[in-house]
Amino acid sequence: MSASDGNTAELWVPTGSVTVRVPGKVNLYLAVGDRREDGYHELTTVFHAVSLVDEVTVRNADVLSLELVGEGADQLPTDERNLAWQAAELMAEHVGRAPDVSIMIDKSIPVAGGMAGGSADAAAVLVAMNSLWELNVPRRDLRMLAARLGSDVPFALHGGTALGTGRGEELATVLSRNTFHWVLAFADSGLLTSAVYNELDRLREVGDPPRLGEPGPVLAALAAGDPDQLAPLLGNEMQAAAVSLDPALARALRAGVEAGALAGIVSGSGPTCAFLCTSASSAIDVGAQLSGAGVCRTVRVATGPVPGARVVSAPTEV
């Protein structure tokens, strides 16, 4: 905040803001282990960051506050239930300070859409506070804090394409030689990740939903930069559960392929569907046809891979 007479030096409080841009993710490959005794599932996944981004602006303030605008903003809490708020508290605790910042999130990543938007926002807050407060917290410490917040948060820091294991938080960079073109179809309503996991457990108890092979061929297709090679290898063991809970997803997946996409997949726990296309022009055509097909709420065209959470405006005096 600035003094009413404009003389900020008299405040003895640093002022300014930092804006961080952070991408959503698509899981190109997602294998889910059986439920463990602690309730978690071991994952093997290939994360892919795409150019659908949230912008998170953090300013110094008297107290911690959170405001959201944009895609699905009215569906999210603006208090300690929000992962971005928790990230601010965790970073402040890590450096022994009070979390006195205001956070503004301009959302484009769908809420409860299987693209890790909440995790992305949390990662962005860590990066923004590190820059705003000039903390120079090392990258390895940021990764540790990210993992404490949730299993998708480390990848939002990492970006690009990565192989995730454990609960998804243990990452290894994957070579991706090309820009891949995507159409993202947002569903009318969200799916809770916990509900999709529970449905997957139920389906496995009563039957044998599809299991994926090893991710090696997916990694080879990414290294080759070939969308035609990658398309038939896209796989998500949570897809059957997501479709079971929201049968309209099957129609959306079918419509995308009929519109000319190489392949379609439910992203993560859904319900966002991601369609791989041969080119930028093909993605525009597929997106236009999907928009008019009545199978989804909104369509976005995106590319990947893109970088993880990064500062787009450094600390500035206000």
Curated annotation (Swiss-Prot):
Per the record, the pathway is: Isoprenoid biosynthesis; isopentenyl diphosphate biosynthesis via DXP pathway; isopentenyl diphosphate from 1-deoxy-D-xylulose 5-phosphate: step 3/6
GO biological process entries = isopentenyl diphosphate biosynthetic process, methylerythritol 4-phosphate pathway; terpenoid biosynthetic process
What are the positions of the active site?
25, 152
Where does the chain bind ATP?
110-120
- InterPro entries for the chain: GHMP_kinase_C_dom, GHMP_kinase_C_sf, GHMP_kinase_N_dom, IspE, Ribosomal_Su5_D2-typ_SF, Ribsml_uS5_D2-typ_fold_subgr
User: Which reaction equation describes what this protein catalyses?
Assistant: 4-CDP-2-C-methyl-D-erythritol + ATP = 4-CDP-2-C-methyl-D-erythritol 2-phosphate + ADP + H(+)
Q: Which Pfam families match?
A: GHMP_kinases_C, GHMP_kinases_N
Pro-peptide positions on chain: 2
Gene Ontology terms, MF aspect: 4-(cytidine 5'-diphospho)-2-C-methyl-D-erythritol kinase activity; ATP binding
Give the record's keywords alphabetically: ATP-binding, Isoprene biosynthesis, Kinase, Nucleotide-binding, Transferase
According to its UniProt record, the EC number is 2.7.1.148
By its UniProt entry, which NCBIfam families does this protein fall under? ispE, PRK03188.1
Q: Which family does it belong to?
A: Belongs to the GHMP kinase family. IspE subfamily.
| Miscellaneous comment | Was identified as a high-confidence drug target.
Q: What does this protein do?
A: Catalyzes the phosphorylation of the position 2 hydroxy group of 4-diphosphocytidyl-2C-methyl-D-erythritol.
**Protein name per Swiss-Prot or TrEMBL:** 4-diphosphocytidyl-2-C-methyl-D-erythritol kinase
